[in-house]
């Protein structure tokens, strides 16, 4: 028995980047918490990150990712480089290799998915979603993205609400964070 499910989505639209997640934590067949926070602002709010999977593993990955960002020391933020460096460590480190989590990271220019196998994927669309309800949220977001009147915030919120209606491991206690694109 283990912790299961969540839904996290990242969207870029109309000069904004949003990362949003539901709040449900499930252990086996039991909902343990309905208002967990699964997204974080990093580097003084310049980067948004969200996770699906084991909470303790995700916190470890947040910390490692933030270390990779700060390691450069020149003040320039390159989430692609940091994500690749994290993925290299994830694949080669005996302890990190056992972590069971996925991450979405986004800044004003990029959205990246960092998988549990150490892959880094930059989606073709300005939408990506992970977790048990990820496919539902992703499909809904692709449809909502065609509506020019909807903001990134509205697309994320509506997409997660759809996922919550369909996925038993996703709820409608949604937390959203937003940054302005450069």
Curated annotation (Swiss-Prot):
Subcellular location: Cytoplasm
Regulation: Allosterically activated by HslU binding.
EC number: 3.4.25.2
Coiled-coil segments: none
GO biological process, one term: proteolysis involved in protein catabolic process
Keywords: Allosteric enzyme, Cytoplasm, Hydrolase, Metal-binding, Protease, Sodium, Stress response, Threonine protease
UniProt-recorded name of the protein: ATP-dependent protease subunit HslV
Organism: Borreliella afzelii (strain PKo)
């Amino acid at each position: 028995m283990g912790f299961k499910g969540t839904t996290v989505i990242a969207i870029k639209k109309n000069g904004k980047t949003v990362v949003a997640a539901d709040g449900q934590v499930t252990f086996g067949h039991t909902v343990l918490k309905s208002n967990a926070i699964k997204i974080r602002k990093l580097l003084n709010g310049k980067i948004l990150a969200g996770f699906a999977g084991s909470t303790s593993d995700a916190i470890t990955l947040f910390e490692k990712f933030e270390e990779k960002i700060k390691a450069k020391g020149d003040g320039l933020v390159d989430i692609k480089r940091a994500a690749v460096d994290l993925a290299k460590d994830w694949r080669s480190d005996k302890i990190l290799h056992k972590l069971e989590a996925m991450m979405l990271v986004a800044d004003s220019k990029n959205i990246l998915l960092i998988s549990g196998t150490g892959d880094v994927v930059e989606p073709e669309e300005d939408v990506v979603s992970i977790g048990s309800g990820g496919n539902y949220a992703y499909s809904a977001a692709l449809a909502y993205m065609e509506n020019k009147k909807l903001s990134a915030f509205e697309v994320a919120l509506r997409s997660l609400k759809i996922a919550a209606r369909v996925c038993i491991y996703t709820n409608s206690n949604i937390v959203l964070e937003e940054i302005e694109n450069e």
